[in-house]
Amino acid sequence: GLGGGVKVAKTAEEFDGYANSILDMNLVTKQTGPGGKRVKKLLIEQGLNIAKELYLSILPDRATAKMIVMASEAGGMSIEDVAEKTPEKIIKVYVDPNVGIQGYHLRAAAFGLNMPKATMKPFTVLLKNLYNLAVNYDCSLVEINPLIITAENDVIALDGKMDFDDNALYRHPDVQGYRDLDEEDPTEVEAGGHGLNYIHLGEGGNVG
């Protein structure tokens, strides 16, 4: 990983070394900000024979009042860097939420990613389920990076991220059960306990 938080271990000794170096480290990424976050947990995954890495996300676009399926063949790297340096590598498919995702949306995304024929069905099933998840759970972002194609033509989400609209969480008590308060701003957590929304404006922030 770009911040040093992802390692490939091929032996038990390598695993022990990486685990000891990552736990308690201060991980700095674009998501954490310059202050970083202390690593308290490790996620261990099986290694796979990766043939291709893709990027896939779904998010609302307030300017058009539509949902955007955003995808790129430049998976496994920062999508912000891709957008800045090679925006032509990002494809966008706009979906009217009143109609929902249709076959032509799924095909547009699949063809835009140059999906092999053998992966078309599993990819379109995954994308449709991902869209429904984003809409049904009031997500402000659902992201898979990377979405991989293996040498055996399996389509697998290696890493995923979901952002929920805090103002809609009351409709999803099941989601609240997954909250990790250690990863949230303590001041925001305390304010939320009193039914308040707290927004930190930074050291020099002001209103009015």
Enumerate the language-model features and the residues they cover.
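ATP-dependent carboxylate/acyl-activation modules
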Residues: G1-I144, I148-G208
